[in-house]
Amino acid sequence: MTLASMIEDIARRARTAARPLATASADTKNTVLAEIARGLAHGKREIEAENQKDLKAARDSGMSAAMIDRLTISDQTLESMIKGLNQVIALPDPVGRITGAWTRPNGLEISKRRIPLGVIAMIYESRPNVTVDAAALCLKAGNAAILRGGSEAFFSNTILARIIGNALETVGISRDSVQVLPVKDRQAITELLQQEAYIDLVIPRGGESLIRFVVKHSTIPVLKHYKGVCHVYVDETCNMDEAVDICINAKTQRPGVCNAMETLLVHERIAPLFLPRMAQAFSAAKVEMRGCPATLAMVPQALPADETDWSTEYLDLIVSVKIVKDLAQAMAHIAVFGSDHTDVIVTDIPENAETFINTVSSSMVGVNVSTRFNDGGELGLGAEIGISTSRLHAFGPMGLEELTSTKFVVVGKGQTRQ
């Protein structure tokens, strides 16, 4: 079987599996998720052994520490996967939910109901926990899933796929409801992106090059999880202790994730007091600073930033720093270099906070908080499949509801159109 025919067969089987899955009860879907959680707990040693194969290859290839962190399945990661499954079980099933109902003057009773999207293909990098998260959310929303993780996580994703398949089979649901592409060949992605006859939506989640590749080659609608060039703007008046804490958390808690801060913008009036303190905190946290000329004058140990730094998602302990004249210049910078992901203002001026909220168009705009809160769980939405930077269909964290669509149901008593 050629690669092209293998990928088409996987997509065809996913489409076939999606039909009965769309009408599966909430109890049935929750039972599958509980079985996956049980399988993860029982398969801990085997999962860790397969993950070690990926980690060894990553270290041998010189992968960065931040990327290795994303690739690692620790005890904590496994517990987080199981916790995530239980959280999805606890969420209400969106399928069949009536989002609106009304009666027309001619007596027609009209309702709008949530339905599964169908077959979702997800293409992502590094983090094998995404395999479990994506499978859980797609299944709970009644969708079949085709998953293609990064080749660097091949062994980890393969064992996770087996556990998911076993859980499906135990409950009497087709294993084809969740499939992980069984090959590392990048051409498999290209072939997958041509299966518009069977796949309804593609969700890429990874670096800029992956997103651009998917958008360029897909004949299927794409919901982008684009890069996170996230900003914190420190306004002319603010609580500087809070500002330092926010910036350290936003940059260092998990530097390799999409909602980490990449650029710090500082008002010129507060910069002489704030930046030396911030630089000291960054230095203690081993964060490399890359600054504009005005920043370098105040922080001699910083490296000079060039134009590419302002649009770079470092995913590492690096931050670009720019001193701006005022709020307007900060927002203009974000409009040019931001990625519509997450942007925050730290300020004591309510009018400036409101202007920032109304002007900046990112999927999460924050006031006096860390960028790290742009997350489905932290926002109280439950689990998420990613953070969409597309405005069509979904914008921001994508939970269960964002993995469904709607249909109209019209009930009459023999009415005909006049």
Curated annotation (Swiss-Prot):
Keyword Cytoplasm in record: yes
Key words of the record: Amino-acid biosynthesis, Cytoplasm, NADP, Oxidoreductase, Proline biosynthesis
EC class: oxidoreductase
EC number, UniProt record: 1.2.1.41
InterPro entries in the record: Ald_DH/histidinol_DH (IPR016161), Ald_DH_C (IPR016163), Ald_DH_N (IPR016162), Aldehyde_DH_dom (IPR015590), G-glutamylP_reductase_CS (IPR020593), Glu-5-SA_DH (IPR012134), GPR_dom (IPR000965)
Any single Gene Ontology cellular-component annotation: cytoplasm
One MF term in the entry's GO annotations: NADP binding
Record localization: Cytoplasm
Pathway per the UniProt entry: Amino-acid biosynthesis; L-proline biosynthesis; L-glutamate 5-semialdehyde from L-glutamate: step 2/2
Catalysed conversion reaction: L-glutamate 5-semialdehyde + phosphate + NADP(+) = L-glutamyl 5-phosphate + NADPH + H(+)
Main localization of the protein described in the UniProt heading: cytoplasm
Biological processes annotated in GO: L-proline biosynthetic process
Family in the record: Belongs to the gamma-glutamyl phosphate reductase family.
Function: Catalyzes the NADPH-dependent reduction of L-glutamate 5-phosphate into L-glutamate 5-semialdehyde and phosphate. The product spontaneously undergoes cyclization to form 1-pyrroline-5-carboxylate.
Name of the protein in its database record: Gamma-glutamyl phosphate reductase
Species assigned in the record: Desulforapulum autotrophicum (strain ATCC 43914 / DSM 3382 / VKM B-1955 / HRM2)
Taxonomic classification: Bacteria, Pseudomonadati, Thermodesulfobacteriota, Desulfobacteria, Desulfobacterales
